[in-house]
Amino acid sequence: MRRRRPRRRALAGEAGLPRYTPRIALRSIDGHLTRTAHQVMAWYRLAGQAWSFRSDSQRETLIRQIAAQLGELQGRWLHLRVTTRPYPVHRWAEAFDKNAVDRLPDVAGALSWDAFLEGEQRHLMGLSMADKEVFLGVEVSGRSMLDRWAERVAPILGKVAPAAARAELEALSSEVAHLDSIVAGPGLDAVPASAEDIAWLMYRSVALGLPAPRTLTGFGPGPARWDAEDLAAFTEGVHLYQEPYAPTVQVIGRLRSQTVRRHVAVLTVGLMEGLYIPEVDDPWMQHSDRLPFPVEWSARMYIRRPEEVTGELQRQMGKVRSQIRHYTHDHDLDPPAALARQAERVLEIEDELTTGLTQLNTRLYGWWRIAVSGRDEAEAIARAQQVLELYRPKVRIEHPEAQYRYAREFIPGEPLASTAYRRRGSVLWAAAAVPAATASVGDRRGIMLGETCTATRRPVAWDPWLAQEVRRASGLTAIVGGLGSGKSFLTGLIVYKTLRAGARWTVLDPSGPLAQLTRLPELAPFSRHINLLRAEPGILNPYRVVAEPRLEHFADEEDPERAWRRERSLAAATRRRLVLDVLTGLLPYDVARLPHTRIVLLRAVREVGGAPDRHPGMVIDALRRHAREGEEHAGVVADFLAERRELPQAALLFPDTSREDPWVGDRDYRLTVLTMQGMTLPRPGSPREEWTDAEGLAVELLNLASWLTQRTIYDSDRNLRKGVALDETHFLSQVPTGKVLIDRLARDSRKFNVRALFASQLAGDLLRVSGFASLVNAVFVGRTDDEEAQAEALRLLKVPTGVGYEAMLGTLSPRPREDEGPDDTPRQFIFADGHGGVEKIRVDLEAPHLEHLRRALDTNPNATRAAARSSSSDAARALSSGSGSADAGALPADGPAGDAGASAHPAADERVELLDDEELDLVDDLDTPDDTRDELEVVQQVRVPREAAR
C-alpha cells in the first residue's frame, strides 16, 4: 500500500499583488524614449538659438534650416514643450569658487570671500531668473498588439527570455538613430534628452504651474529606465481638479513637506494675421519671454505627407478662385484685400504643386497651447489677460473651456483634449516661431555682471580669462560709450570682482575715481594708488616703461635663448621709438614738423641706444655734443627740450640717477591704480597744431603711463591671471607708439594670460588702430548718440550695420523724464562676449553686500556732500577755538587715526606712502567730545576711508 505524501502549505506568491496602473497615459521611459499603449516617442533637447543682433539673412537662414528639418519628419507626430528651469545658482557658485585661483586672503573686519560669495548667491536667487528649455518629442513608431503584450508580461519575460523583452527597442534602434541625425543638424541643434532632462520635463508637465523644486534643479544622472511603477514618482502627490465652468484648473502638490496650490489658465493660439518674420516681427513664440512670469508652451503637430496635401490644396484653391470670380465677373467689383492676398498665395501654392512639394513647403497642422499660473484664480486670469494683450492685434489668443483636459495635454503621451483651434500652415510658418530663440551671452563660471534685458531675461556671468586659457583667443576688450554711459562703473565692477577671485590688476585712470578701490577695506592691504603727477622723478622714463624680456618667458620656444635675444632687440627698438615720439611731442608744433628736427633727434636717440638704464637727459646731452660739432639745429632742439625739462610735470621723464627705479615696490601688490588728476588733455578730435604746450605734454605723459601699465604683464609669471585697464585710450590712437602698445597688448594677451580693457568714448578711435577689430575679443558698448559713432560701434561688435541697430544704441540706459533726482539707474550695454553671443545687458550692482562698492564707484557730483563737509569743518573749527587748548589738534596715541593705517597696510612706511595723495581732514585730528561724535561720524566715514576700513 502506497503511503501518501504530506501536503505542503502553498505560498502566497505573486498572484495576489495588485496591479499598478499610472494615472497618465505614459507606461515607461527608456533612455530618451517614452512609450504609451499606442505610441513610442523620442525626446530631444533643443539648443538655444541667438536671435538678437543678427541680420535678416542670418535669421532667414535659421528659419529655413529648422523648416528643412521639420520637412524631413513627414508622416510623424511631434510634441513641442517649452518650459523653464530656475537658474542653477549653486552650480554657478561652485564653478566660480573653483575657478577663483589664488584669491585674496580675507581681511579682519572686512567683507570676507565666503560672505562675498554668499551675498552673490542670495542676490541672484532673489532675482528669480530662469533658463528656457525646449524639448521636442518625435514619433518613432506605433505599437503593435505584440509590443503591448510583451510590455504587459515584461516582468516574467525578462526572467525567461531577456532578449525578447528588449526586442521592441532593438527593432527601433536604426530608426531612432536616423531621427537623432535629422534633428542634430543646424537649426534645431537637438541632442537626445538625458535622464535629468526627462525627469525635469515630466515634473514640470505633471505638476503644471507649481513652483520648481530645488531638489530637482540639481538632479544628477538618473535611471535610464522608468517602468510603470516608477512613474508614480511624478504623479503621486500632485492632483489636478476643476470646478464646473471654472476658467482655471487647480493644481495641488507637495513641495518640501508643504501643500502648495496654484491656479493654471490654459490658452490656445487662434486665428493669426500674416506676420513678416524676420523683417518686421519677432518669432511669435518668443513674445511670451517678455512677460515677467513663467509661461509654458505645448504644441502638437503632424507633418503631412505630400499625397495627403495635394488634393486638399487644390480644393482650397478652387474655393478662392470661385470667390474671386464672384466679385469680378458676377458683380464687377474689386475683391477685398484679404481675398486678394489669398489669391496671390494660391498662385504660389500652385507653383509649389507643379514643381513638387519640397521640404521647405511641406504642410502641417497643429495646436499650440499656453499655460500661465497664479496663486489664486484672479492672478491666473490677470496673467492670462496679459498674454492676450501681448499678442494683439495680429494673433488671437483664446481661453477655452475644459481646462482640466487642456492642462493634461502638456504631459508627454497624453491625448489631445480637442481638435478645436487647429492651425494649418507650412513648415516655414511653424519654423518662424523659433521656439528656442533666447538670450545667450557670457559663460557660467565667471563674475556676475548683471542680466540680459532683451526679450529673455537671464543672468550674465563672464570669465575674462576663459578666452585665453580655454579657447586660445586674445584678451583684448573694448569699452565704448559717451559721457555718463557707465564705462568707469563697469570697469570698477570687473576689476573688483575679478580681484577678489585672484586676478592682479593695473589700472590707468587719469581722472582718478577708480582710485577709491584701493581704499576699500578688503582691498587696501593689497593695493597702492600712485598719482603720477606727484610721483618720484623718472617714474615715466621712456626707457624704463618698456619691460625688459625675461629668459624664463621663452622656455617653450624651440630655441629659448635665440627668441629671448630677439625680443630684447625688439624691446630696445621700441624704447628708441618711444623716446623719439615723446621728445618730438614735447617740442612746439612748428619745430616738430620740420624734417630736420626728426633727423637730429633720430641721430641722438640712436647714439644713446635702447638699454633700460638710459634716460631722455642723455639724448639732450647728445644733441648738445652734436651742436658743438657744427650741427646748429641740434642745439636749437636741445634748447627747446631743456626748456620743457624745467616744467614740473616733465620731471617724470627725467629720473634722479641717485635712486633706484621708483616703479619697483617692496611688495607684490594685487592692485595698482595710476591716476593723473589735474592733467589737462586736449579736446578729443582737435588737431595737433591746436594743442597747447601743457596739452601736448599731457598726451605724451598719458602715452608713457599706458606703457608703464602694461609693464606689469612682463614683470610677473606669465601664467598668473593679470589685467590692465586703460582709460582715455582715444589719445593713444593718435600717437604712433600708442598704436604699437595696443597692438602689442592684443597679441601678447593670450600668451601672458592678460585681460586688457580699453575704454574710449568713440569706437572709431580704436578702429583706427590697424587690426584692432580682428583682434578684439569682448566688447561693451554703452549709450552712443552720434550716428557715425553708432555705426563704428556696431562694426566693433561685429553686428550688421544699416539694418536698424544703430538707433538702439541711442536708447540704452533710458531715464524717466519726470525724475529730477540723480541719474543712478543701472547702466545698459551691448555686450559681445567674443564667442558669438551678443545681447543687451543691464549692469547690476544692487546687492546689499556691495553697497560700499557702489558708493565708491559713484562718480556723480553731489553738492550736499560738499555742504556737509563745509558745515562739519566749521563745527570743528568752532570746537577748536572754544576749547582754547594748545594741544587741541594733537592726535591721541590710541586714537582712530593711529589704527587706520595699520588696518590698511602692515608696515608704517607703506601707510605714509598711501596717504601722500590724500587730503587730511582736520576733523580727524580732534579729540571729539561724546556729544558731537555722532554728528561728525558721517564725515569721518566719507573722508577718512582708513577709519571705515577699520
Please annotate each region the language model reported:
Residues M1-R27, V40, S57-A68, Q74-G75, ...:
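An aromatic-glycine-centered, glycine-rich loop/turn in mixed alpha/beta architecture
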Residues R27, T34-F96:
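Nucleic acid-processing catalytic cores of prokaryotic defense/repair systems
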Residues D56-Q74, E308, A407-R422, V427-P459, ...:
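P-loop NTPase motor domains
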Residues R81-A110, M125, F489, L493-R603:
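Switch/coupling segment of Walker-type NTPase motor domains
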Residues K98-A108, E273-L360:
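Surface-exposed, low-hydrophobicity interaction/linker segments
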Residues Y327-T328, R458, W465-S485, L490-K497, ...:
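Conserved P-loop NTPase motor cores
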Residues V803-N860:
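Conserved P-loop NTPase
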Residues S883-V938:
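D/E-rich low-complexity acidic segments and tails
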